[in-house]
């Protein structure tokens, strides 16, 4: 395995649930610090990193709709949850002396900068980790879609999707011990098989922009850096 990173600019997608650890709600600071240390390791390798965090540990917009409420309002609440998570992760990174900026799709200048592609590219060029908050800024779009969109806008060479397991399996390995992990799939195979990697819009957007999706376990300390150098357990979704 090469010690040099395979990718120089990447987008890391982390779910809100990843930040809550074993808790049933909110943010486990120890977990946030550990994820931050993995990102810091990538930065020390010279990799430019953008991050999209979900908000499911705080609120899910679909929960409002399922109870008969307004989906748009619910999604706005979920977007605010992603901003809380982004600020928490930024705090963990700054404790490690990693220069970090939060760019929000929802304008709130007293708290963080507003997103623009120009600001993104500037901060990346200055060596900062850029955390994208607020999803796409629009209801009905998941943070997976936000990850694919921001990856395309920042010119990322790959999307790293940190999940609960170390890749894409034929079935849920926690429920079906005989499930097997795919080493490699195409974007179209993911769509045709209905594999729950990212939502359909996100996978399609990644495919249209020729961005590979690398699925790995976000719970393995040092796993992000290992995969950046070509090692580790993972599934690569790519048409190349």
From Swiss-Prot:
Residues 21-26 are annotated as: Involved in allosteric activation by GTP. It is an enzyme of class 2 (transferase). The keyword Oxidoreductase does not apply. It comes from the Bacteria. UMP binds at residues 55, 75, 136-143. It catalyses: UMP + ATP = UDP + ADP. Allosterically activated by GTP. Inhibited by UTP. Signal peptide: none annotated. It holds the Pfam family AA_kinase. ATP binds at residues 13-16, 56, 60, 163-164, 169, 172. Keywords: Allosteric enzyme, ATP-binding, Cytoplasm, Kinase, Nucleotide-binding, Pyrimidine biosynthesis, Transferase. HAMAP family: PyrH_B (MF_01220_B). Belongs to the UMP kinase family. NCBIfam families: pyrH_bact. Homohexamer. This is Uridylate kinase. It comes from Rhizobium etli (strain ATCC 51251 / DSM 11541 / JCM 21823 / NBRC 15573 / CFN 42). The lineage of its organism: Bacteria, Pseudomonadati, Pseudomonadota, Alphaproteobacteria, Hyphomicrobiales.
């Amino acid at each position: 395995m090469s010690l040099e990173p395979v990718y120089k600019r990447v987008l890391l997608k982390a779910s809100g649930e990843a930040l809550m650890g074993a808790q049933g709600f909110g943010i486990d600071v120890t977990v946030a610090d550990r994820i931050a240390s993995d990102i810091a390791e990538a930065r020390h390798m010279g990799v430019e990193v953008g991050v999209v965090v979900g908000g499911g540990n705080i609120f899910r917009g679909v929960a409002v709709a399922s109870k008969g409420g307004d989906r748009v309002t619910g999604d706005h609440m979920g977007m605010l949850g992603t901003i809380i998570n982004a600020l928490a992760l930024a705090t963990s990174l700054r404790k490690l002396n990693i220069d970090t900026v939060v760019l929000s799709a929802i304008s709130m200048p007293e708290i963080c900068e507003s997103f623009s592609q120009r600001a993104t590219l500037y901060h990346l060029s200055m060596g900062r980790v850029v955390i994208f908050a607020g999803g796409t800024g629009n209801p009905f779009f998941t943070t997976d879609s936000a990850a694919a969109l921001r990856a395309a806008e920042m010119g990322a060479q790959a999307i790293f999707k940190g999940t609960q397991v170390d890749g894409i399996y034929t079935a849920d390995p926690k429920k079906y011990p005989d499930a097997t992990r795919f080493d490699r799939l195409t974007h179209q195979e993911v769509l045709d098989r209905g594999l729950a990697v990212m939502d359909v819009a996100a996978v399609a957007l990644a495919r249209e922009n020729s961005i590979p999706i690398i699925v790995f376990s976000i719970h393995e300390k040092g796993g992000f850096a290992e995969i950046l150098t070509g090692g580790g357990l993972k599934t690569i979704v790519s048409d190349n």
